[in-house]
Amino acid sequence: MDMALPEFSMRQLLEAGVHYGHQTARWNPKMAEFIYGDRNGIHIVDLTQTVPMLDQALKVVRDTVAKGGRILFVGTKRQAQKPIAEAAEKCAQHYMNHRWLGGTLTNWKTVSQSIQRLKQLDEVLATGAEGLTKKERLNMEREQQKLQASLGGIREMGGTPDLLFIIDVGKEDLAIAEAQKLGIPVVAVVDTNNSPKGVDYVIPGNDDAARAIALYCDLVSRAALDGMSAQMGAAGIDLGALDVAPEEETLEA
């Protein structure tokens, strides 16, 4: 059966600045085949290639979720942190947006122990932390905040993911190396200054502009939701009957 997939147009990509690469001097020759030309010293990405490649990436995201797989969204640079977290939360997936924790994939056992510690701290602090001195409580709160910042987005992952979605492969090279070691496929936005090496599903495009990042995150999140509805549909659940409560979104300042 052909499942739905979020639609997007070349025009949307242009409006979001997906075609703007980096200064020609900063280019990576490995991206040459995806470069259309240059304008005022800036490389322009060939969107006639980006469109089908982005479509292919979204299919992989959707199909992974439809089979019950887990997706890890990775983007730790400042302008990607919020959209990465929001997109992952919107489709009940997982994210790392603070700093890539070495061993997140290759040493999952140790990472899951830290997640257990975070859950334990949450519990103790939520129940009022009785019998603790002020100093002990403060230390616990500090430890909790630190763990929450680095592990909050993967606390419910429950094991290594089945697919990674990455923004800025130059910055997230450690994540790619770990995924390669474990044979976990990678979907990633690759700008003209980076190498597509190690990326299974390349999305050639700008990885700095806020609007471009927001667009990729939104599309990937919607593709994951399409996969989820396909999975539930296969299980005979009517999604129309499950109204998603929008209330909680309005609480955010």
Swiss-Prot record:
What organism does the record attribute this protein to? Cereibacter sphaeroides (strain ATCC 17023 / DSM 158 / JCM 6121 / CCUG 31486 / LMG 2827 / NBRC 12203 / NCIMB 8253 / ATH 2.4.1.) (Rhodobacter sphaeroides)
Q: Which family does it belong to?
A: Belongs to the universal ribosomal protein uS2 family.
Record's Pfam families?
Ribosomal_S2 (PF00318)
- An example Gene Ontology cellular component term from the record? cytosolic small ribosomal subunit
Keywords noted in UniProt = Ribonucleoprotein, Ribosomal protein
Q: Name one GO molecular function term.
A: structural constituent of ribosome
**What is this protein's record name?**
Small ribosomal subunit protein uS2
CDD domains linked to this entry: RPS2
Matching Gene3D superfamilies: Glucose-6-phosphate isomerase like protein, domain 1, Helix hairpin bin
